[in-house]
Structures are given as C-alpha cells and as structure tokens.
Design a protein with these regions (language model features):
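TPR alpha-solenoid repeat register
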Residues: 41, 75, 108-109, 155, ...
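Residue-level recognition of tetratricopeptide repeat
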Residues: 4, 38, 55, 72, ...
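J-domain (Hsp40/DnaJ) module recognition
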Residues: 241, 323-368, 387-462
Length: 462
C-alpha cells in the first residue's frame, strides 16, 4: 500500500510540475486514501489547492499535516500563506512565529512578514475611513488589501457594502452573489444584497433580505439598523403620500422633509421624496422652493423626466420663459411625445410674447380690463406724460417723457381696438405690422376731441 501511495505521489508531483493541478490533486488524494497518516501527502495536496486558489482547503490540509508532524516547517509556511490570502492576520502571524522558532534564519516568509505588516496598516486605514463614511477611500484601500489577501471574503463584502453606499449597486451585487455561491449562509453577503435592493428603491425586498440575515445571525447589527431604517422610510413616504392626496399639503411637506434626513446616500428614494416635496411646494404657492427641489432631483438623476417637466412648469408660471424653454427642450430629448412637443411650442410662444412691449403694464391695467378702464387709464397717463407738461424739463427728461407718451399712445391704440387687442392677446407681433407710422399726438388729439368735444381743452398741473 505504501509503495502504491508513493507512486501516486510521484505521479502527482509530475502533474504538479506540468501545472496540471486538477490531475495532481486527484493523484495526491489517491495517495492520502492509501496512506492517511502521511504529513507530506497532505502538504503536497495543500500546495496543489493553493495553486488552484482554494485557500480554505489548502489551509485545512496544511493544518492536518502539522497535526501529523508538528515539526513540518513547509506546512507552517503554507498555513501562513493561506491565512494571509484569507485575510487572517493573526493566523498568519502565529504560523510565521512558529517557522522562525523552528528555523530562526529561515528566509521562507520574509515577503509574508512584510505583507502582514502592510495588511494590518491597511485594515486600520480602512476602519478609520469607514467610520467617517469616506466610502471611496475605503474601496481604494480595500483594493490594495485584496491584492495581498485575494480570498478574504470579509474584504470583498466590505468593499461591496461601500460600493452600494456609493450607488454602484451592480458592482456590489456581483460581489455579493459571488460570495453567496461560495457560502449561501453568509449573513454579510445577504446583507449587501439587501442594501442593493434598498438603494434601488425596492424597500420590501430589502427588508426581507435584512430579516433573512438576522435569521442566520441574530446579532447582525447592520441588518438590524437597515431593517429599521427601511421600515421607517417606507412608513414616512406612504404617510406623506396619503397627506398629499388628502390635500394636507403643509403636513405632507413636513413629513417629506423629515424623510429626506433618514439616509442621504439613498439617491433613488431621495429623488422621489424631493420630487414629491416639489409638488407640495407648487400646491402651496412656493414655486421657487419647488424649483430648488427639482434642481436637487436632477442633480441626483438627470434623467428624471417628471422633475424636469415640473421645473419647466414652475419657470413658466414665474414668467421665466427662457428657462422653461430650455427645460422643455431637454425633456424632449429624453422623451419625444406629442405632449412635450406641445409644451415646448407653448413655452416658445410665451417667450416670444414676453419680449414684446407689455401694453397692459404700460397703461397699468389688468389683462381683463374693460374698455372703460382702458380709456380712463389712457387719459390719466397721457396727461401725466404729455410733452407739453415737461417743456421746462431737461433735454434728457423731455426725451424720456416723449418715449413714455408714445408708448402710452401705442398701448391705447392696440387695446382700444377689439381686433388689434385680440391679435395682440393671441401673440401676434402687431407692433411691427401696424405701429410703424403711429402718431401719438394725433391719438391724443383724437381722444380728447372725442371725449370732450371739438373745442375741448385741458390744463396741466405744473
């Protein structure tokens, strides 16, 4: 039996040297089954497992070899290397210490000694950055740690957790799923998967994952905190929505504001809460605050079409037509619908109208002013700004008053004529078409002759 086992080992060595590690593994296993008390066979198979990156199995074999032969130096070397690859700093240090006790001048683990020191420093740096929520730094330093300890599931999952906090949920999920394939009962992996669901606005499934992690590990504090946060956020969002639907807008505003304080990292949820609060602001007349909320939504998610359309509407209501046009143009790039095309067309028309003279404003009347109100307004303003009243003023003041007098006449000429007024209200550029030869003095004389007779006269109060 021993002879056959030795032959198996030799064949295994040949396959190992040829880098046929799977074949070598089978041959070493055959040798072990024939001679289970050989520390060397376990040592060889441990080396083979290491080449296959199966550090857990390699560590098991190396430790078994040590139990069979406590003076087996190579086995301790392999334990140190495996512990280092698995991120077990204490295990690696103990193995290195034993090797040096067996052979004080041994150069076998010089690199590993340096790597252990570096890994310990990296762990401290990672923890400090994690505590201050500097998650990008954590990922950076964990990448360095994983170069030393590539099989450390703890490092992988902590990196995945931080990636989730950074919104890189696809990457985080890939890591978590990979770990779960190795260990389906990993509470940390299930926790990370729950985080990814939570940060992609799937609170219900997130809660289920946190509860599953707690079933596997009742003391899993992160899952406890996240389950509580999920439930609180879900409840507050639903409460805010209920208050909004029932018209209790100011109460809804308070709830949405409080909900936004729960987790600044949850961009998907916060963008919805901000959009909902923006809607509330429009209902209570706080259009500028609504725009600020929409700005924050679009900073979190530039593709959030509803926020873009709401901001455009607020700009339009505030007569900030250029901003409204810009928003509708961006919205049209995201979704080319007939409704958005119509909104853009209307905004451009409103912008064009806004650049014309505002005859209602010039006369100081409302847009629904009656014919009599328009006449009274013209009479009052024409008398105030008539050039004769300012004959003794400076040249600059006379010029200014003449311009105002002319504009007042133009305004009255349009608003007192039903056809022209209708065209003006519809947005047509009447000024260019019909006002080119307008004479404000003729308008003034005609008005007062019509109002007071052929010999009507008036006196200015200087």
């Amino acid at each position: 039996m021993l002879y056959i086992a030795e032959e198996k080992k030799k064949l295994g060595n040949d396959q190992y040297k040829a880098q046929n590690y799977q074949n070598a593994l089978k041959l070493y296993s055959d040798a072990i089954s024939l001679c289970p008390d050989s520390a060397a066979y376990y040592g060889n198979r441990a080396a083979c497992y290491m080449m296959l990156l199966n550090y857990n199995s390699a560590l098991t074999d190396a430790r078994h070899a040590i139990r069979l032969d406590p003076s087996f130096e190579k086995a301790y070397v392999r334990v140190a290397k495996c512990c280092l690859a698995l991120g077990d700093i204490i295990g690696a240090e103990q193995a290195i210490k034993t090797v040096l006790e067996l052979e004080p001048q041994s150069p076998a683990l010089t690199n590993e000694q340096q790597s252990v020191q570096k890994l310990r420093q990296l762990e401290t740096t990672v923890q400090n950055n994690y505590d201050t929520q500097a998650y990008r730094n954590v990922v950076f330093y964990l990448d360095s740690a994983l170069k030393i300890a590539p099989a450390c599931l703890r490092y992988r999952l902590l990196k995945a957790e931080c990636l989730a906090y950074l919104g890189r949920c696809d990457e985080a999920l890939d890591i978590a799923v990979g770990v779960m394939k190795l260990d389906s009962t990993s509470a940390d992996a299930i926790y990370v998967r729950g985080l990814c669901l939570y940060y992609t606005d799937n609170l219900e499934k997130g809660i289920l994952h946190f509860e599953r992690a707690l079933q596997l590990d009742p003391d899993h504090q992160k899952s406890k905190r996240m389950r509580s946060k999920c439930k609180q956020l879900k409840e507050m969002k639903e409460n805010g929505n209920m208050l909004f639907k029932s018209g209790r807008y100011r109460e809804a505003h308070v709830v949405y504001t409080d909900a936004l304080k729960i987790d600044e990292n949850n961009k998907d949820m916060n963008s919805k809460l901000l959009y909902n609060r923006a809607l509330v602001n429009t209902r209570i007349g706080s259009l500028r605050e609504a725009i600020l909320d929409c700005n924050r939504v679009l900073e979190l998610n530039a593709q959030y079409l509803k926020a873009l359309l709401l901001r455009a509407r607020c700009h339009n209501d505030l007569e900030k037509f250029e901003e409204a046009v810009a928003d509708y143009e961006t919205a049209l790039q995201l979704e080319k619908t007939p409704e958005i095309k119509r909104l853009l067309r209307d905004a451009k028309f409103a912008l064009k109208k806004s650049k014309r003279k505002d005859y209602y404003k010039i006369l100081g009347v409302a847009r629904n002013a009656t014919e009599d109100e328009i006449k009274k307004a013209y009479r009052k303003k024409a008398l105030v700004h008539h050039p004769d009243r300012h004959a003794n003023s400076s040249a600059e003041d006379r010029k200014d008053e003449e311009l105002k007098f002319k504009e007042i006449g133009e305004a009255y000429a349009i608003l007192s004529d039903a056809r022209k007024k209708n065209r003006y209200d519809s947005g047509h550029d009447i000024e260019e078409q019909e006002q080119a030869d307008f004479d404000p003095n003729q308008m003034f004389r005609s008005f007062f002759q019509f109002s007071g007779g052929r010999n009507a006269s008036f006196n200015f109060d200087y």
